A protein has these predicted regions:
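Helical scaffold of the NTase/Pol beta-like nucleotidyltransferase catalytic core
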Residues: 1-38
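Alpha-helical structural context detector biased toward long hydrophobic helices
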Residues: 136, 159-161, 165-171
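Membrane-interface amphipathic segments in extracytoplasmic regions
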Residues: 5-12, 31, 61-62, 92, ...
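Metal-dependent nucleotidyltransferase catalytic core
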Residues: 17-20, 61-101
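Internal, conserved structured core segments that host functional sites
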Residues: 86-146
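Single conserved hydrophobic/aromatic residue that forms the stacking wall/gate
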Residues: 172-182
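Active-site nucleotide-donor binding segment shared across nucleotidyl transfer reactions
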Residues: 25-58, 67
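Short, cationic low-complexity segments
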Residues: 145-159
Length: 183
């Protein structure tokens, strides 16, 4: 969560998030793309059957194969009120994953307020690569990837500050010959 919201602001934000999620699910179901909720979204679904009252986003995950399929079909399948934001469609995005954003809405994260990218309210879509079956190995992989994420996000912010570009994202939005390094 980036800031404090009033209850009314959160209600409006949650309504938009559910709308975006519904459209994302529609596309996934039409194309037989399995997905799963993650992070705070999973906790909210488990305990409240809803978005956590204080949460300002929804996170879903897909295997890399399904993520790539989603990236291929979503630009044509999403309704006109939605936009698939990732490095191919929103070249200034500093993110290494995709977002389904709602047009004609505004949600700008403070650290990216000067980045010329689509400003809409969004649902995050994360690719999952080479997930180990072993619980300990999954934990190690998760910690390593969390560290890598922090390094990348810091690098991206620095790059925007100094160069106004984020070419490093290309390394992490498509399959890599290094896939499986941690498994």
């Amino acid at each position: 969560m980036n800031k404090k919201y009033t209850a009314e602001e959160l209600d409006l934000l949650h309504a938009e998030l559910y709308d975006i999620l519904g459209e994302t699910i529609r596309v996934c179901q039409k194309h037989n793309i399995p997905y799963f909720v993650i992070g705070g979204t999973a906790i909210g679904a488990l305990y409240d059957q809803a978005v956590l009252p204080w949460d300002d986003d929804i996170d879903i995950g897909m295997t890399r194969e399904n993520y790539n399929k989603f990236l291929k079909v979503a630009p044509e399948e999403l309704g006109p009120s939605y936009f698939l934001s990732w490095i191919e469609t929103d070249p200034h995005t500093p993110y290494y994953f995709a977002k389904v954003k709602k047009n004609d809405t505004l949600f700008v994260e403070e650290m990216f307020k000067n980045v010329p990218m689509h400003p809409g309210i969004f649902v995050d879509i994360f690719p999952f690569d080479k997930i180990p079956d072993n619980k300990l190995l999954r934990r190690i992989q998760s910690e390593a990837l969390g560290f890598l994420k922090c390094c990348l996000m810091g690098k991206e912010i620095w790059m925007w500050k100094h160069f106004g570009t984020c070419e490093i994202c290309l390394l992490y939005t498509s399959p890599s010959p290094r896939d499986g390094l941690l498994s």
